[in-house]
Amino acid sequence: MAIILLDTKTINRIAAGEVIERPASVVKELVENAIDAGSSEIEIKIESGGCNLITITDDGGGIEKSDLELAFMRHATSKLSDSELIEIKHLGFRGEALSSIAAVSRIKLSSKANGASEAWSISYEGGEKIGELIPYSLPQGTHIEVRDLFFATPNRLKFLKTERAEIQSIVDIVNNLAMINYSIGFTLTSGSKKPLKYAKQTSLFSRLCEVEEEFQDNSLEINEEEDGVRLTGHICKPTVNRGKSDMIYTFVNGRPIKDNLLVSAIRYAYHDFIPSNRYPFATLHLEIPYDQIDVNVHPNKSEVRFQNKRLIYEIVRRGLIKALSTRTGNSAVSNIDRSRCQGIGKETSGLPFDVSESQGNDNHINNGKSRETKSERELYERRPNPFENRLMKESNSPSVGKKDLSERSVLFDSGIQKSLSQAKTVVLEREQIDLIENHPLGFARCQVYNTYIIAEARGKLIIVDQHAAHERLVYECLKQKSSIKRQKLLLSEVVEIKNQAGMEMVEVYKDKLFEMGFDIQINSENKVIVKEIPAILGTIDVKEMLIDIVDRLMEIEDMLPIEDKVNKILATIACHGSIRAGRTMKLEEMNVLLRQMEETPYSGQCNHGRPTHIEMKLSDIEKLFERR
């Protein structure tokens, strides 16, 4: 077959395939143009998910009459010159959007430039100009109508999703652009449904709370800077998380981007607080010198290349860890509202119109609820053996909680050996009042289902998951100890490791496990002898614990720093070494646990990311009973 030169019409349609993939692509390109034009209000209207009609109206600088036809030519732009290619500051710069949209739709653009006496309109259909420029009634800015998207390339329609899914994709685009451009007002209307409207704001946080209300009461501020790179934004406490990453918003120099490096750094910062299959809520803005970043990677302009990836990763990781290291890590899950008590799921999209079918199987904010494995759940709920019911000793004196965590007791068979025997007397009424009024977790009133502690604090009720709470205490105590005391087993335990990979893990980490309190000797090709275990664990099932540790070692990524690998092993040890659901506790024990939670970092979540406690404000309880 002979080689031929493609005509302009065909070239434009091929190019449009990269730029315009779906209706949301049209919205993205045209709204970005409106932002670059200096608009203060942008209105978007769609019909049939954007396939039948998309209109964008702005009050920006507009386009001169003499430039209207030129604007539809490929690679025609007012935003870029040769000298600016390495310092791109606008959202749009390739000059492909209008020509690509015109190639696959029927488009009409009307605009009135600043200082012009009247507006003018131009139309294209399938890439060809229709008629001449005509006058148009428009006070200021630009109005664009895109009809019958992909009529010229009907095969593309087969690859579109449902109408609701396309609407959701458009909403995601608008949310992203509205988030970072908080000084601009945005309105999105789908058919006759109630509009999604964002008023002009004076700060990113104000806009953030408009888009996702979970940030209102659960936000941690981020502010980090190094070598001319600045990171700002907000993240949510670990107890607010979900099963997919759609609540992670990342921006670079005001441009919404999707970058695995940033997501990886965010997930690393949270890895000690939420399960591996959960994602946090985060909105981060990186300001980077323009000559240190390349945004000209893909026609959709959502990908970038960083000159110094290591620096970017470290700034994000460090900034988030600093925020998560504040005492807010001890906070409870947000208050339980009335709708939750009635079992009504809270929508997370913030949409006035229904897009539920496109949300997948995990529509709702999890607030720390993880998908536990069967073995983890069985371990969590296992009934204690008789030895676990033995009370260990800890003083309930005023000095408790003021010592360094590594010197303090954690409780019971799984804890450091101190006594509760001095706390046998009933707490006096005045002491109860002091605890309720002056301590965040208040005074324990009772235990229900031998699993949850009910405590009264000032103006609120606290419900504590005893296993989850104690697991975090044991874990943090283990992490802070430079050397862990060992206890010799009365009878050494022989443990069979059923696969060769597991035995290799034991050999590789044998010395590190010794530092953690385990004296392990390899007996044969598939058996090891455990002679000593960490004293903090008390009486446990040694075989089950070692097998769990080996399984965990095989799951750990090789690229993780050794400190992270150690912490993951310690988390497994802590899970085995903490009190179980089903363990009966005395009132004195409950209150010691509450005091230690108040003094322990990150006590708001267990090692798997579950909440350790929740709170209900008195005002919310009164609303449940219609007293308010």
Curated annotation (Swiss-Prot):
Q: Name one GO biological process term.
A: mismatch repair
A molecular function (GO) term: ATP binding
Q: Where is this region: Disordered?
A: 350-402
Keyword list (alphabetical) reads: DNA damage, DNA repair
UniProt entry tagged with the keyword Transit peptide? no
- Basic and acidic residues: compositionally biased ranges: 369-393
Chain intervals with Polar residues compositional bias: 356-368
The Gene Ontology CC terms held by the record are: mismatch repair complex
Pfam family membership, one: HATPase_c_3
PROSITE patterns under this entry? DNA_MISMATCH_REPAIR_1
Please give the InterPro entries that the UniProt record associates with this protein.
DNA_mismatch_repair_CS, DNA_mismatch_repair_MutL, DNA_mismatch_S5_2-like, HATPase_C_sf, MutL/Mlh/PMS, MutL/Mlh/Pms-like, MutL_C, MutL_C_dimsub
Its family?
Belongs to the DNA mismatch repair MutL/HexB family.
What is the purpose of this protein? This protein is involved in the repair of mismatches in DNA. It is required for dam-dependent methyl-directed DNA mismatch repair. May act as a 'molecular matchmaker', a protein that promotes the formation of a stable complex between two or more DNA-binding proteins in an ATP-dependent manner without itself being part of a final effector complex.
Q: What is this protein called?
A: DNA mismatch repair protein MutL
